[in-house]
Design a protein with these regions (language model features):
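Short catalytic/metal-binding and nucleic-acid-binding patches
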Residues: 1-166
Length: 166
């Protein structure tokens, strides 16, 4: 175990319980980048309901078209959503896509009888680096239902859509 320096107060070393930045501080997420998003539902497995799953998938595609994002693919699992997209050429920051999508789908979920909050407050995003192509990330993303035992092949999972070759 590492020893702390004698002159450093313990309270200055504490990180648990504090809010951490989930986005890179100097990145506006609106350039020529590919982003893998993972958004978690606030409650257990709401997407097992067909009406809700259809609404979520429809709106992933809608908000990508509306904000001129390139959508490579997505996979909706019972309790979370994976999306691979790129804001390249849209001039719109990722925060706007997230705010619009999460706000609208929360509103629509209330019409379907769900109580807010619908999404967890933050999500995970991962910028695809040079060593990992969007194709590799998409291949990983679509295999989620297979790894979880929900489908034998990714093509058999109704809430997966691929819009690029893998």
């Amino acid at each position: 175990m590492r020893r702390r320096r004698e002159n450093t107060p313990l309270r200055d070393l504490r990180t648990y319980g504090s809010t951490r930045a989930v986005r890179l501080p100097d990145c506006d997420y609106s350039g020529d980048i590919d982003i893998h998003l993972t958004l978690r539902a606030d409650r257990m497995a709401p997407f097992k309901h067909r009406d809700l799953a259809q609404m979520i998938c429809k709106n992933v595609e809608f908000y990508c078209r509306r904000l001129r994002y390139t959508l490579y693919g997505y996979c909706l699992m019972p309790d979370h959503l994976h999306v691979l997209l790129s804001p390249a050429g849209s001039g719109t920051a990722l925060s706007r896509w997230l705010d619009s999508f999460k706000s609208y789908t929360t509103h629509e979920s209330m019409k379907l009888g769900r109580r807010p909050p619908f999404w967890q407050r933050s999500g995970n995003d991962h910028i695809c680096r040079a060593a990992e192509t969007a194709e590799k990330v998409l291949a990983y993303l679509v295999e989620n239902p297979v790894r979880a035992g929900l489908a034998e092949r990714w093509e058999g999972w109704p809430w997966t859509k691929v819009l690029m070759e893998i």
